[in-house]
Structures are given as C-alpha cells and as structure tokens.
C-alpha cells in the first residue's frame, strides 16, 4: 500500500519532469527566434567581413597602439575567461540565468566580450531573451571568423564610454586629451570601468562612482594576477588624483 510519502515523491518527480519539459520547449522557441533574429543581421554585415569593415573606419585603434594595462584591465573586469571560451561562456551563462530567474529580471548579463561586440554591432540594447539567444549565435560566428586580438580590437573601438565618446580613441582624447598609446596606467584603469554603465560612472558627473568602479577593476586585476595588491593600491591613489575626477 502506497504511503503518503511515496505519493508525494511521485508527484515531485512528475513536477520536475514537467518543469524540464517546459524549459526545453521554451528554450527551443527562444533558440528559433534567436536564430531568425541573428540571420536577419547577416546580409547587411556578415561576420566574415566584420573585421575588414570595422578596421577600415577612421580612427580604428589596433592593439599595438593600446597600453597593455588597458587590455589587462578590460579582460579582467569584463571577461576574465576571454582567451579560453569560443564566444560563449557556459559558466557565466548559468550564473546569469540563475540570477535572472531568482530576481525575475534580466539584470545579470553573463555576456562575453564577443557577445557584447555582437550586441553593439547587430542588435539594440533592449533586453529580451530572444536577443540574448541571437547574441549567442552571432558570437559563435564571430569567433569562427576572427582572432581573439581582432575581436578585442573591434570591441574597444565600438563600445560607448559616455560623454559622447565611442571607442578607445575618442575616450582617450575626450577625457584626457591623449591618444590611446599615451594613456597612463591610472587612466587605463579608469577607462576600463566606464563601459559597464557610462552614464552612472561618468567621471564628469559622478566622480565618486567612477572612483569606486575603478576599485572594482583593480580588484579584478589582482584576482587575475595582473597586479599585486601593492600595485593596485598605488594605482588607486593615482586614479583619485586624476584631474578629470576633480572637474579640472
């Protein structure tokens, strides 16, 4: 004779199975929608021609003209597994999905640099699940046709830094009156933190938040072994003394 405990176990198993089926069906629908959205972008600018097209734009800055500190800072704070994944980071996706489901929002991105590049080039910044699926397809295609260095260069030349500055060249000039190659390590760290939320972290309007964000960047660089704790403390003092944070 079945006990109440046995019945509850069976009900739980069926409920879990039903939930898995619903998730699988939803994933299939989103996958199809994402694929269609991604394919619609390709006739205008195919992934195979992306680097050739973007690198021909005036002011495009290559890695040999960008300080290593800036490269290290961006990868540390935005996509520490950049060199390991193929455009999509399953670990980051699972973490982001769990956060989104738990908070019933789309607040957590989990996007790699390649996905962010795909979003900047092909899609709007309005968050919805179909667009996230389309980003995955686009990122995989970009990684298939472009090297990691090319992807990084395209990313830093298309992201928004706030104050009307798009790309590292405009940001270096707009905030510091320099070329990217002339940036100091402190300036590199400050700039690396801005694209996450350009309006919120603007050195002009929110210097305190910009300084706090730079500390996040430094902490990530220490975690990724790109800086020692002593070097990070010294850089934070240099960042705090930057004229752009003092309104001068």
Regions found by a protein language model. Give the residues of each.
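Juxtamembrane regions of bacterial inner-membrane/periplasmic proteins
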Residues: 1-248
């Amino acid at each position: 004779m079945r006990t109440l405990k046995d019945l509850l176990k069976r009900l739980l198993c069926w409920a879990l199975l039903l939930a898995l089926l619903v998730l699988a069906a939803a994933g299939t629908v989103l996958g199809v929608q994402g694929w269609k959205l991604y394919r619609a972008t390709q006739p205008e600018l195919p992934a195979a021609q992306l680097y050739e097209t973007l690198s021909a734009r005036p002011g495009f800055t290559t890695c040999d003209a960008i300080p290593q500190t800036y490269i290290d800072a961006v990868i540390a704070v935005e996509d520490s597994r950049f060199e390991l994944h193929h455009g999509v980071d399953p670990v980051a996706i699972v973490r982001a999905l769990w956060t989104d489901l738990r908070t019933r929002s789309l607040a957590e991105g989990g996007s790699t640099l390649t996905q962010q590049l795909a979003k900047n080039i092909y899609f709007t910044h309005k968050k919805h699940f179909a667009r996230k699926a389309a980003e995955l397809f686009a990122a995989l295609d970009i990684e298939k046709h472009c090297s990691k260095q090319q992807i990084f260069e395209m990313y830093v030349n298309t992201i928004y830094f706030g104050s009307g500055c798009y790309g590292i060249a405009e940001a270096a000039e707009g905030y510091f009156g320099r070329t990217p190659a002339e940036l100091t390590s402190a300036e590199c760290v400050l700039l690396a933190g801005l694209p996450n939320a350009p309006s919120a972290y603007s050195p002009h309007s929110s210097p305190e938040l910009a300084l706090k964000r730079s500390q996040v960047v430094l902490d990530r660089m220490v975690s990724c072994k790109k800086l020692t704790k002593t070097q990070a403390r010294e850089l934070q003092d240099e960042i705090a003394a930057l004229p752009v944070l003092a309104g001068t």
